[in-house]
Amino acid sequence: MDMMLMIGNYFSGVLIAGIILLILSCIFAFIDFSKSTSPTRTWKVLSIMAFILGIIITVGMLIYSMWGKHCAPHRVSGVIHTNHSDISMN
């Protein structure tokens, strides 16, 4: 749960880092494709790794924000208590 609290505290920073990685992947791909010589493996690997990490971080942050709105522990426990009587809780 410490990881969730850390992500909650630095949500905007992590989301910005994911967007920056996506921008970097576009820059690396542009550098790779703009060469007149044969493309080097280094720029391809940098572009692919930046893209994959950027997508994982960005989609992960979107999923985390939905989790915080709909599945946070205080919301789930509140729903359980309102939907069940005291007898079924015991």
Curated annotation (Swiss-Prot):
The entry's comment on post-translational modification says: Phosphorylated by viral OPG054 kinase, phosphorylation state is regulated by OPG106 phosphatase.
Q: Which residues carry this modification: Phosphoserine?
A: 85
- Keyword annotations from UniProtKB, A to Z: Disulfide bond, Membrane, Phosphoprotein, Transmembrane, Transmembrane helix, Viral envelope protein, Virion
Localization terms from the record? Virion membrane
Q: Does the keyword DNA-binding apply?
A: no
Q: Does the keyword Transferase apply?
A: no
Cellular component terms (Gene Ontology): membrane; viral envelope; virion membrane
Please report a single Pfam family linked to this protein. Pox_A14
Residue spans, topological domain Intravirion:
1-10, 66-90
Tell me what the record says results from residue 85 to A: Loss of phosphorylation
**UniProt topological domain (Virion surface) ranges:** 32-44
Outcome of mutating residue 25 to A = No effect on phosphorylation
Judging by the UniProt lineage, the source's domain of life is: Viruses
- Family named by the database record: Belongs to the orthopoxvirus OPG140 family.
Q: What does this protein do?
A: Envelope protein which is a major component of the mature virion (MV) membrane. Essential for membrane biogenesis. Is required, together with OPG144, to form bona fide crescents, which can progress to form the immature virion (IV) membrane. OPG140 and OPG144 form a lattice that is stabilized by disulfide bonds and serves as an anchor within the viral membrane to which several other proteins important in virion structure and morphogenesis attach.
Give the quaternary structure: Homodimer; disulfide-linked. Interacts with OPG144.
In Swiss-Prot or TrEMBL terms, this protein is called: Virion membrane protein OPG140
Species of provenance:
Vaccinia virus (strain Western Reserve)
Higher taxonomy: Viruses, Varidnaviria, Bamfordvirae, Nucleocytoviricota, Pokkesviricetes
